[in-house]
């Protein structure tokens, strides 16, 4: 089972990417995935959507096809978003516009919101409300909000708040188990063929 983690921060060396790499290793260590991969939006590697995607533009195909294959080969996802001004970063919202060929469809995804303080709820609501319609990603009823992120999940234990760090490490294992179970279950749904339709390609 392969789980792909999407780190949605544009910043280099971001806290979101730190959490993504920690979670990728946690999934492996706890037998919740056999392979993981982190894809980071640091530095904006994906241009803003334009009609060239629909028209089969060669430059878009060269950029997206390798990533499309990795997404299609994944059984589930972890979507990590920092809270910027109470919002999901533009690059992460743009990410969801790029996949309309079933790469994400009917696959489970765990939302992980990242906050440097006590916030983090707004990205969860925004992603659940508006990022799934046409790509048909399936968000779990479980999510994580990693608050005061600078003080948890650091490799240097002296930088962690011991009690809070322990809580988030345990909660990540719990959520990873749910993601893994959903990934197994939804594989059967996709293989049944019931989700395939050339008539109803877009959500309502």
Located regions from the model:
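Short acidic capping loops at alpha-helix termini that bridge into adjacent secondary structure
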Residues: 34-35, 106-108
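N-terminal beta1-alpha1-beta2 submodule of the flavodoxin-like/Rossmannoid cofactor-binding fold
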Residues: 1-97, 160-173, 186-204
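Mobile beta-alpha loop/short-helix "lid" or hinge segments that flank ligand
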Residues: 37-48, 101, 134-158
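Short, glycine-/small-residue-rich phosphate/pyrophosphate-handling segment
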Residues: 108-152, 167-170
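Acidic/histidine-enriched, beta-strand-rich ligand/metal-binding domains
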Residues: 90, 103-104
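A glycine- and small-aliphatic-rich helix-loop capping segment at beta-alpha/alpha-beta transitions
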Residues: 94-102, 129-134
